[in-house]
């Protein structure tokens, strides 16, 4: 490992030397070897959700939000209506995407520390039969709250509606089985729990829905139907692919399998989260969420109630000790966030806790 700080963020995150070294090779975007690399990545991604029988994996250049916008724009018909479930900033982003795309939508918003319930969704769908799709965030990255995906998905299926899942911060670490959870689209990205680098999103699109989506898209570049059709025909991307990102993700997926796949990745992140929560509690810092709805991905902490605490100063001091934290993203209270993901283990998390404790002493922050 270099002397670069450890990124305790929800992505981009700290990657392994092997993953970074995979980007030292240049690839021809139309070359057969690169096409095989793309196909291998998509095959491995589908295997994580046991989705090869029911879904296509459609990769897309750009951040995860590019892929979310592409999924909504491609799969929601122009006369469709989306019910957007919100309990944080990324749910708000789903609604903004629908608005910009001109898709009819309604929203249901709960407090930032309250998961949406299946009963909420049941009531909302019963009251509005015009809804065609429901969009939700699985793990809301602004807090780390985990929404009850399985229960909500069953309600949506019972009402005959279609589910779009933003699984950006959960895919690869939390179990999602396409054979058990009915969804039309699930979206994730290269630079999160798979421990690749940012630059590629991907959409698991239900096969029949994708086949029926021709002409829906608002954009040429974000047309997932066209993207998939071209890849299926030629093995190639329509437009210049992020070759180095894909090579890094391929290497990261090899390491994912070597570690033990999803169960092992989940366990390491859960151990990281426990170390973080226990350590921060020991120095008096309170987590924002109760344990039963806290995902082991990113943890939000209340900022110290002391005039000597200023986040910018705190951040720079912790960075000088080797750790990059994340600012809070809540609307009502001052917080900061610490990620549990990336190439880091419990020992690294304890070192981060020790750094935070040292910094608070240096700042003479007493009222925690």
UniProtKB/Swiss-Prot annotation:
One of its GO terms (molecular function) is 2-aminoethylphosphonate-pyruvate transaminase activity. It is an enzyme of class 2 (transferase). GO terms for biological process: organic phosphonate catabolic process. Transmembrane segments: none annotated. It catalyses: (2-aminoethyl)phosphonate + pyruvate = phosphonoacetaldehyde + L-alanine. InterPro entries: Aminotrans_V_dom, NH2EtPonate_pyrv_transaminase, PyrdxlP-dep_Trfase, PyrdxlP-dep_Trfase_major, PyrdxlP-dep_Trfase_small, SP_NH2Trfase/AEP_transaminase. HAMAP family: PhnW_aminotrans_5. Homodimer. This is 2-aminoethylphosphonate--pyruvate transaminase. It comes from Pseudomonas putida (strain W619). The gene is phnW.
